[in-house]
Amino acid sequence: LKMSKSLGNVISPEEILKKYGADILRIWVAASNYAEDLRIDHKILEQHADAYRKLRNTFRYLLGNLNDELKEIDFTQIKIDSLPELEQFILHKLYNLNESFMKHFNSYNIHLIYKELLNFCTVDLSSFYFDIRKDTLYCDEKNSKKRKDCQLLLNIILDSLLKWFAPILSFTTEEIFKLLNKNDSEKSIHLKKLNVFPQSWHNTKLEQNWQRIIDIRNEVNSSIETMRAEKIIGSSLEANI
């Protein structure tokens, strides 16, 4: 869309702020490649608003399963070999994501940062890790090791996402950070340093193994959806693999 005052199709920042909020406008800026012509219309803004809702749902899930608490964790004290393989794989994902974040941040490719963070939240977390571990969080004994290990990961994920998203979702991350630090109004997410992840979290062999599992899982889910669409089964629980 080429905006022109003479055509009367200009979308003012004030209009965007009033309808969508400041962070949606910030997402539009962050998601745009400044090396190309910038495009904006209400359809594009609605797409960003939908992505924002998914991100808020990710934060809501993390907060709900951590009881609105965020603990300070010394990463060097984590015995990674004692964690389930799935948790080790997610730590590997976090390590790689942080490497990409620093690379893109230092080269001012903010749109690539946003793209990778959004993909991590919607694909790696919501559609994969959260989906697999929901039974553990909701059904296992409160103090079981498996559940505690999962909550450890959720704590690390929440802390990392708040710091990564702070330059983009400035108001949302501050709102969440204030919720987690009710007793200290002087604290701000924008004063926190980025995490430094141990090299031991990087595990290429583990990633290769889990990628095969993910490929099989995706194929199975695709077949299940086809069977549901054809009314062969009513629920995925009825499928035999």
Please describe what each predicted stretch is.
Residues 2-81, 182-185, 233:
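Catalytic adenosine-cofactor/nucleotide-binding cores of aminoacyl-tRNA synthetases and other
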Residues 9-13, 115-119, 123, 173-182:
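Conserved alpha/beta core surface patches that mediate binding of polyanionic ligands
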Residues 24-31, 59-62, 117-121, 129, ...:
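Short alpha-helical scaffolding segments that buttress acidic/His motifs in well-ordered protein cores
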Residues 40-48, 109, 146-154:
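Membrane-interfacial loop-to-helix junctions in multi-pass inner-membrane proteins
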Residues 49-52, 56, 91, 95, ...:
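Generic structural concept
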Residues 68-99, 103, 131-223, 230-240:
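Acidic, turn-prone loop/beta-hairpin segments
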Residues 101, 105-112:
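Short helix-adjacent coil turns
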